[in-house]
Regions:
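Zinc-dependent deaminase catalytic domain
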Residues: 1-139
Length: 139
């Protein structure tokens, strides 16, 4: 029997990513990233858009692409233990930019699930071109 009140793993992980995003000091774009094992048994890393450790978290600008902050994806990838042999997937509150998408491809993450689309889908296209599974959480 299926418990219809039991939340899916996608829902749980996306809620965690949304909560992590609230750590960002950016007033417009609070972005969260969460890396988990594909079998949903381990949280491996997390990140949000913010500055380098010890530096001011005040964005240089509120204009898109000009904040000067590290993107959530990069912060999560920097903290990831690459020795873990399990396959990995990443949950994002915003689809990746092209730069972050390339970093994700190089990290050997196999699937990316995003909540909202970035201002362009160039990053999503890069992930697809590299044969990663990529999908909108809302689809």
């Amino acid at each position: 029997m299926v418990d219809i009140n039991r939340p899916s793993w996608d829902k749980i992980w996306m809620q965690v990513a949304e909560t992590i995003a609230q750590r960002s000091h950016h007033s417009t774009f609070k972005v969260g990233a969460l890396i988990v094992t594909s079998d949903n048994t381990q949280v491996l890393s997390l990140g949000y858009n913010g500055n380098a450790a010890g530096m001011s978290n005040v964005p240089q600008s509120e204009e898109p692409g000009c904040s000067g902050l590290l993107h959530a994806e990069i912060n999560a990838l920097l903290k990831l233990d690459y020795n873990n042999p399990k396959t990995k997937k990443m949950y994002l509150t915003l689809s990746p930019c092209e730069y972050c998408a390339k970093a994700i491809v190089n990290s050997k993450i196999e699937e990316v699930i995003y909540l909202k689309p970035y201002r362009d889908l160039g990053g999503v296209n890069i992930l697809k071109e590299a044969n990663l599974k990529v999908r909108s959480y809302l689809d």
